[in-house]
Every structure is written in C-alpha cells, then in structure tokens.
C-alpha cells in the first residue's frame, strides 16, 4: 500500500514539475511606435491572444450550426400601433393593406398576416427600422464625435505622441484599452 502511494505521489510530482514555467513579462520594456505601427501595437495589446481564440471559437460555432429562422411574435402582429409601423417600413407593401390596418378590416389583416409570414423580412431589420424612426428626432443633433469627451481624445493623442517620441510600455498601452 505504501509503495502504491509513493509511486502515485512520484507521478504527481513529475507531472507538476513539467508544467510550463511563467514567461518573463515584457510589459516593462519600452517600445517606440509611430503612426501605423502604434495602431498595430495598440490593437495587438488590446486584442490579445485571448480575443483571437474566442473569435475562432465563435466562427466554428457559426459554421457548425445552421441559421435559425426568425419568427415575428404574435404580440407584435396583434398590436395595431406596431403593425402600422411595420407597414410603413416595408417597401412595396400594397396601399390597401396599409389602409386596412387603420380601418380594422379583418379579412385584409389576415392577408397581411400571411404576407408578413411569407416575406423575407428579418426581425432584426424590423427592430432597427423601428428604432431609427423612433429616435429620428434625437438623431438630428450634432455629430456623435462632438458628444465624445474631448479630454479622452486628448489623452489618446498624448499617448501616441509619447510612444512615438519617448517610448511606452505594453502595460501603459493596456491601460488605454
């Protein structure tokens, strides 16, 4: 029994001694990078090997699984407000069907239901269309860049200048991710 225990203990010790050692960190090494090289270095640091591995796994899953059919929930089709918004967003929809939703004609609404089932509309496209029409008034404001804090943009520019002129470490670049 003791011999069996010692042989297993020796086996575990040998396995643990073969684990890869920690590679010395290169985070403190100064790197000089300007322009495209700086952008590539920033992408390399922020999108490390872990991200690449995750993206590869997602690609494999997409290739294996078949595309799922999207179904419009019946609660959307039964709601007259949403239905009228859907009709406005569908190009080439007959005017009769648009009027039918407003007047409440059941026969034409049933036809509409079949048209919507047969159409190649994607639920995500319909959601985007609704969100675009819903927030159309809000989008007429100034560009999105003006809303982005200027201080953060200035820090990014200062960091690129520092990496170009003086040099920066991977740790400093990682803090900007």
From Swiss-Prot:
Pfam families: Insulin (PF00049)
SMART domains: IlGF
GO MF terms held by the record: hormone activity
PROSITE patterns in the record: INSULIN
Propiece residue ranges: 63-149
Superkingdom to which the source organism belongs: Eukaryota
Disulfide bonds: 34-164, 46-177, 163-168
DNA-binding as UniProt keyword: no
Disulfide bond as UniProt keyword: yes
Signal peptide location: 1-25
Location of the protein in the cell: Secreted
InterPro entries: Insulin-like, Insulin-like_sf, Insulin_CS, Relaxin, Repro_Hormone_Insulin-like
Family indicated by similarity: Belongs to the insulin family.
The protein's role, per its UniProt record: Relaxin is an ovarian hormone that acts with estrogen to produce dilatation of the birth canal in many mammals.
Subunit structure, as described in the record: Heterodimer of a B chain and an A chain linked by two disulfide bonds.
Protein name: Prorelaxin
Annotated organism of origin: Canis lupus familiaris
Taxonomy of the source species: Eukaryota, Metazoa, Chordata, Craniata, Vertebrata
Gene: RLN
């Amino acid at each position: 029994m003791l011999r069996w225990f010692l042989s297993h203990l020796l086996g575990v010790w040998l396995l643990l001694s073969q684990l890869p050692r920690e590679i010395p960190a290169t985070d403190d090494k100064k790197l000089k990078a300007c322009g495209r090289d700086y952008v590539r270095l920033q992408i390399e640091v922020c999108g490390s090997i872990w991200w690449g591995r995750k993206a590869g796994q997602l690609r494999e899953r997409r290739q294996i699984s078949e595309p799922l059919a999207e179904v419009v929930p019946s609660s959307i089709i039964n709601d007259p407000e949403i239905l009228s918004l859907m009709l406005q967003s569908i190009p080439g929809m007959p005017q009769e069907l648009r009027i039918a939703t407003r007047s409440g004609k059941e026969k034409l609404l049933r036809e509409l239901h079949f048209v919507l089932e047969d159409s190649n509309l994607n639920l995500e496209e319909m959601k985007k269309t609704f969100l675009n029409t819903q927030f159309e008034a809000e989008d007429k404001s100034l560009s999105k860049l003006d809303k982005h804090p200027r201080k953060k943009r200035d820090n990014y520019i200062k960091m690129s200048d520092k990496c170009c002129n003086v040099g920066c470490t991977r740790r400093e670049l990682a803090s900007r991710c």
